[in-house]
């Protein structure tokens, strides 16, 4: 994920109530100059960590009490506004890259696959925009 998207995600996460961010090594460094600038400094204040590419992070998240939510364009996805998503205390929201999305293995282990309903023939948003919409709906209302 490029530095601009990483910075924008940090900014939205901080502004809209996410408590922390977990990155994979496919993500740009949030402290990279462009990321930090776009984040408006939130990359220095919002806690974050990395999952090793070889770790079973879905298992780790679930064993830590998180309900996992994968954002993906799938026919079986529930809409972001579905009340079932608000019934869980700790949510871990997983976003994929814009080019390849989320791996099938990760999707199969997720508690929920969620889609942002779209209008006017648009099927998706940029990952930074999608994260902002998602954080607003799940964490700030």
Short names for language-model regions:
Residues 12-16, 30, 35-43, 104-141:
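Structured adenosyl-cofactor binding patch, chiefly the S-adenosyl-L-methionine
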